[in-house]
Amino acid sequence: MTEFENLTWLHGKPQGSGLLKANPEDFVVVEDLGFTPDGEGEHILVRILKNGCNTRFVADALAKFLKIHAREVSFAGQKDKHAVTEQWLCARVPGKEMPDFSAFQLEGCKVLEYARHKRKLRLGALKGNAFTLVLREISDRRDVETRLQAIRDSGVPNYFGAQRFGIGGSNLQGALRWAQSDAPVRDRNKRSFWLSAARSALFNQIVSQRLKKTDFNQVVDGDTLQLAGRGSWFVATSEELPELQRRVDEKELMITASLPGRGEWGTQRDALAFEQDAIAQETVLQSLLLREKVEASRRAMLLYPQQLSWNWWDDVTVELRFWLPAGSFATSVVRELINTIGDYAHIAE
């Protein structure tokens, strides 16, 4: 299995180094739900600005403040402790009056707004995230500038970031140990983290192998394609290849790669053979996903950061701004720019 730091680069390995996240203010994330609260209902959506607090800690504190069980507070995604983040929490408070959130006191946190909502906010139920990152101690400004222009035009690999695999790859190692044991894993969080790490590692491997081909973004017979910004996909046939290629070149369609698991992978013929060959050596992880009945799915191979802009504060410091759809990793953008000083796995997204 190829380690995250050695996965194939779309724009070649960066020439220079730099520092990501010297302090929390260098990594700012603003959650974009993609909808506005209903204004009525038994749930309350609370938008919180936090610095130095992880999401679960804040959710538990909010539950205590509202005098409800911790399971009644949900969120769409985990946000990093060591960053400045804005995100929405959702509390189920049927039959209760609107609380006075000005009385909610938690160091590093501030309630920005709140409103009633009809539905629970579930994990993954957000449109995306807006990022503002500051990269420091950059050793090669010219190379980074060239890469930013290339990323604006051609995107980056849609890799799952090192955070998915845990500090030192602990989640992936856990998955491997579990796969080779008959002992059940009863901890739901561990099960979720380990299965997610296993499937993500296989996806990354497939994408990395495809990027080694000079024509990696050329549609082949049996590829599965996805409308940009949509979840559904369809299979390419040989008769359609010229027209489908035109739509891929115009970024209207995206070539996808497999999230392996139980059931059909989606690809057929030439594309399926390539994906199977790319992870043929990873039988242990594939067997785990089948044993635990994880359903196969698809994910776009490339990621195009939206609203990408940058501002050089000086020759060694640049501020980046961009928006990514839910499930994408800012660190997968950064790894195409610089060889980072520090451990990606400490940055949750």
Curated annotation (Swiss-Prot):
GO terms for molecular function: RNA binding; tRNA pseudouridine(13) synthase activity. The keyword Nucleus does not apply. Signal peptide: none annotated. Pfam families: TruD. InterPro entries: PsdUridine_synth_cat_dom_sf (IPR020103), PsdUridine_synth_TruD (IPR001656), PsdUridine_synth_TruD_CS (IPR020119), PsdUridine_synth_TruD_insert (IPR011760), TruD_catalytic (IPR042214), TruD_insert_sf (IPR043165), TruD_pseudoU_synthase (IPR050170). Keywords: Isomerase, tRNA processing. GO terms for cellular component: cytosol. Belongs to the pseudouridine synthase TruD family. Responsible for synthesis of pseudouridine from uracil-13 in transfer RNAs. This is tRNA pseudouridine synthase D. It comes from Salmonella arizonae (strain ATCC BAA-731 / CDC346-86 / RSK2980). The gene is truD.
